[in-house]
């Protein structure tokens, strides 16, 4: 799509070079044929090093855009990006017919849907009612249980277990908002990558990335009823217990343990070998090799002392 067409769609004037834009991407990873956006002071620091061919930008930060990059000045870059994301969204059902490659040793049970250009390796088992979208690849000895949904472009390693009714690769919870309180969907063009030996519990959901990939690294085990948001990166050999919620763009190091009903607020990092006790609410970056608990999050030993003081104070008041 030409820059002039994008400008017309957004209702803004543009008189510069009419370059071709092929996709949307983040400031960090965009190439010259891709468009990105900057929605605030925090991200404005990334503009100088961005390789994007065009950037949606507010008037406040337009002077930060280099002469080699097209700047499209809009009132709300995030909203404009959301509107454009629909134009660049990949189709849910491909019109392009590409034969899938299914190993002879794979076992596919009845009522399984397999899309276009799917790669299924040796000794894979896919149980009844599963949905496998276009361009999915599944490594050897992986088992996909009944009614699991694997959306387009998902990459699954070897010897993974995906239990019943899990959903891998659906759109994340991303919206831009108008001044009147209307919400516009951000279409997600990334994917999900599950590395080798990953287990995903029943009714767990892992959202695809807006750009690039949501990644679950080798050996991680995820319990039932867990939500992993878009663009998360879960390190090697993590344990995530039932009903936990990992908000978008959270990064967990290796061997992190998330106790039952624990959660992160998103856009933060948890260090290697950290443990979050049940119902812990993580709202900031955490160092590794420590045990945390409570809300707001603190060292678990401090949280227990705090709880003991509350109980003592309450008891003394009523004696």
UniProtKB/Swiss-Prot annotation:
Its EC number is 2.3.1.191. It catalyses: a UDP-3-O-[(3R)-3-hydroxyacyl]-alpha-D-glucosamine + a (3R)-hydroxyacyl-[ACP] = a UDP-2-N,3-O-bis[(3R)-3-hydroxyacyl]-alpha-D-glucosamine + holo-[ACP] + H(+). GO terms for biological process: lipid A biosynthetic process. It comes from the Bacteria. Keywords: Acyltransferase, Lipid A biosynthesis, Lipid biosynthesis, Lipid metabolism, Repeat, Transferase. GO terms for molecular function: N-acyltransferase activity. GO terms for cellular component: membrane. It is an enzyme of class 2 (transferase). Belongs to the transferase hexapeptide repeat family. LpxD subfamily. HAMAP family: LpxD. PANTHER family: UDP-3-O-ACYLGLUCOSAMINE N-ACYLTRANSFERASE, UDP-3-O-ACYLGLUCOSAMINE N-ACYLTRANSFERASE 1, MITOCHONDRIAL-RELATED. Homotrimer. Catalyzes the N-acylation of UDP-3-O-acylglucosamine using 3-hydroxyacyl-ACP as the acyl donor. Is involved in the biosynthesis of lipid A, a phosphorylated glycolipid that anchors the lipopolysaccharide to the outer membrane of the cell. NCBIfam families: lipid_A_lpxD, PRK00892.1. This is UDP-3-O-acylglucosamine N-acyltransferase. The gene is lpxD.
């Amino acid at each position: 799509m030409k820059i002039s067409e994008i400008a017309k769609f957004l209702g803004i004037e543009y008189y510069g070079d009419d370059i071709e834009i092929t996709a949307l991407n983040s400031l960090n990873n965009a190439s010259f044929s891709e468009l990105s956006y900057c929605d605030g002071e925090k991200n404005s620091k990334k503009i100088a090093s961005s390789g994007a061919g065009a950037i949606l930008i507010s008037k406040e930060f337009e002077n930060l855009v280099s002469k080699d990059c097209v700047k499209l000045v809009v009132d709300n870059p995030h909203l404009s990006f959301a509107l454009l994301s629909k134009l660049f969204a990949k189709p849910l059902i491909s019109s392009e017919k590409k034969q899938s490659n299914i190993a002879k040793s794979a076992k596919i049970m009845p009522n399984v849907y397999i899309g276009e250009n799917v790669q299924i390796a040796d000794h894979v088992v896919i149980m009844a009612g599963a949905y496998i979208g276009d361009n999915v690849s599944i490594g050897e000895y992986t088992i996909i249980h009944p009614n699991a949904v694997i959306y387009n472009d998902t990459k699954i390693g070897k010897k993974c277990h995906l239990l019943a009714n899990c959903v891998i690769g659906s759109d994340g919870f991303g919206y831009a908002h108008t001044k009147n309180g209307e919400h516009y969907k951000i279409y997600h063009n990334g994917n999900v990558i599950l590395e080798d030996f990953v287990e995903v519990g029943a009714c767990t959901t892992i959202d695809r990335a807006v750009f690039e990939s949501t990644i679950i690294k080798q050996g991680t085990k995820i319990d039932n009823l867990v939500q992993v948001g878009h663009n998360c990166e879960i390190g090697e050999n993590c344990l995530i217990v039932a009903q936990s919620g990992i908000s978008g763009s959270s990064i967990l190091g290796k061997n992190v343990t998330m106790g039952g009903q624990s959660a992160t607020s998103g856009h933060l990092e948890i260090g290697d070998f950290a443990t979050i006790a049940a119902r812990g609410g993580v709202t900031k970056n955490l160092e590794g090799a420590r045990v945390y608990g409570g809300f707001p999050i603190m060292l678990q030993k401090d949280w227990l002392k705090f709880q003991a003081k509350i109980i003592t104070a309450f008891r003394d008041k009523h004696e």
